[in-house]
Amino acid sequence: SAVGYQTVEKKVKLAKGERIKVNVTIAPKVKELGEVVVTTSGVGRVNKSAFNAVAVDAKKLHNSTQTLAGALTKVPGVKLRESGGVGSDMQLYIDGFSGRHVKIFIDGIPQEGAGAAFDLNNVPINYADRIEVYKGVVPVGFGTDAIGGVINIVTNKQPGKWFLDASYSYGSFNTHKSYVRFGQIFKNGFMYEVNAFQNFSDNDYYVDTYVRDFEIREDGSVRFPPLDKSKIYHLKRFNDQYHNEAVIGKIGVVGKKWADRLALSFNYSYFYKEIQTGVYQDVVFGEKFRKGHSLAPSLEYYKKNLFVKNLDLLLTANYNHNLTNNVDTASRAYNWRGEFYERGSRGEQSYQNSESKNKNWNGTLRMNYHIGEAHTFTFSHVVSDFERTSRSIIGASSKFTDFSIPKITRKNVSGLSYRLMPSDKWNISAF
């Protein structure tokens, strides 16, 4: 035998004193390798696109206390403004645009009406494989009318046969954050995956402010001394607790002839947020809060080489059912010291126990046809329906009473694009 050749064995019988000449032929050892697939990273692909786009490699930030929103602040032109501690209201700006001008997607699926628990400042960085930021003009595949841009959270779809990822952190103001992700891909292609995370914080940090003092007389009436704004006190926040929990379950199959990926997922989230102040810091609330939950099933189907080679199909559908309650029913008035007196009317700001219900469903069809390595045609159609209803749960009868007109939005967006990419150094997109 020899290195690189097959081993050959032959039996030879010799009589005493006999000599025999034996010819031995050895053949080269050929080993058939499995299919080798060469791919480029999603981060590099986005950064080289013709769009004004940047991709952040989230894997480099895994197992840190960073959130998706915190990672986005590393992108030029992206600004984050939070009104307080953990779970506070957040505004994300892309080149000066915010609000409805900036849309959020997860794996290309729009997240309108997903609920406060899935705000970017509440989702841990481990949930994402990478974060794509498109500024201004966006690919037709998103099918959105966002003039400011799009943020697309891309999760890890190739985790391995079996995986487990978990993290926990504890910080100031009794802040707890935890995350766990586990799943398995079996030999027959069946897969399951579970993601779960939670955030909790008392948010009892100190503020420097003046205090509206009061005195309760013997007859029960309340006297208000003149407000002295020159006296500033160092006091703790006492009605600003926040917590949220979310679970994302997913089952499906991968690597089948009829589907490269078929996955059904179900998301559930809950949040509770106490409200310390209103627009003005000197107006303090001691019992006002907001809570809500969200249910969101979704379906994803992906097939390469559909009917003909180089024709890829992606179908997605999701439904978000989000319910939020704003509760302000206390008959007390508080100051920054946590002191209170009883009022003759209910409601620290405005008497309410309201319910807002969001129903949102989306369907996406996206087809890519590749001609060689340089030409790509993309067709996309997105249909969406959003409905919001609000009602109040107050009154002696404790019955639901409508107090606003339902808000309904329906959209159908189609797009067709062509991309020419003769090399990695330059490409052209038309749509």
Spans of model-derived segments:
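Extracytoplasmic beta-strand/coil segments of soluble accessory domains associated
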Residues: 53, 69-110, 129
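Short acidic/polar hinge/loop motifs at secondary-structure boundaries
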Residues: 101, 109-136
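Periplasmic-side early beta-strands and strand-to-turn transitions of outer-membrane beta-barrels
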Residues: 160, 169, 185-280
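Outer-membrane beta-barrel translocator domains and adjoining extracellular loop/strand segments
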Residues: 180-181, 205-213, 274-283, 326-334, ...
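Structural signature of outer-membrane beta-barrel domains
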Residues: 43, 99, 111, 156, ...
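A beta-strand signature from Gram-negative outer-membrane beta-barrel systems
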Residues: 125-167
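Short, acidic, small-residue-rich periplasmic hinge/interaction motif at the N-terminus
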Residues: 2-6, 15-62, 69
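Face-selective signature of the C-terminal outer-membrane beta-barrel domain
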Residues: 248-271, 290-431
